[in-house]
Amino acid sequence: MVTGAARGIGRGIAERLVGDGYAVVITDVEGGAVARTAEEIGAVAGLEQDVREAASHQRVAAEALRHGPLRAWFNNAGVGWDGDLGELEEEQVRGLVEINLLGVLWGMRAALASFDQAGGDIVNTASLSGLGPVPGLSVYAATKAAVVSVTMSVAIEAPRGVGVHAVLPDGVATPMVAQMKDTGLAKALVSSGGRLLTVEEIAAAAVELMGSRRVLRTVPAWRGAAMRASAMAPSLASGAMGLFAAQGRRAVRR
């Protein structure tokens, strides 16, 4: 099961799983797009789903179980509207929280209820922004911090044989990043790592978590360490953010 898989990271994860021989069910809020993607990559089903609705996860879980035992559930659906807290519309704030966080929680619950005695893996798409301050992406980062937190907690709660993981990428070359405001602070910070990561890199990192004892995987590792350091002294992080932003703006101009 892969949510948010019509394009971007979700599609990349699904393509890799199909290539590895899995029967893959993919979902997306855009029904036509996910149906086309399913046909193009060889997924067994492409279903329209609004991850904000708890019942939708039970419905797609039932469809997945029609094709065999459930072995992995990837909670990937998400949105990334950028802007300071005071700039975002109320609908955007609500959407960020409901899609990025509630969508993951409902998906995790459905997966846990659907695994058989052989167990399985839950892999959540989080973000490096969930590890420290990211001005210009404050609400998005808050939702991803919550995903990191619940991943670590449920990894302990989960029954034996069930692995719970999250992949935390830096900026990735996806439509989500492309739609960010070119002059905004968020776009600059997301682009400050030297280059945007590829969908294929993150898909590989996510799929490799299946069967692993690792709970969190940051990509790249050095940026994860930098974000954790900024979280330890947020009052001192503004200077570093300025340097990262300047580097990112140069990258965006290129």
Question: Can you describe what each PLM-predicted range is?
Answer:
Residues 1-25:
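Canonical Rossmann dinucleotide-binding motif of NAD(H)/NADP(H)-dependent dehydrogenases/reductases
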Residues 20, 132, 153-163:
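Active-site-adjacent segment of SDR/Rossmann-fold oxidoreductases
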Residues 84-85, 89-94:
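Substrate-binding pocket helix/loop in short-chain dehydrogenase/reductase
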Residues 86, 134-138:
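Active-site loop immediately N-terminal to the catalytic Tyr-X3-Lys motif
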Residues 108, 143:
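Active-site helix of classical SDR
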Residues 127:
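Residue(s) in the substrate-gating loop at a strand-loop-helix junction
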Residues 166, 187-227:
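C-terminal helical subdomain
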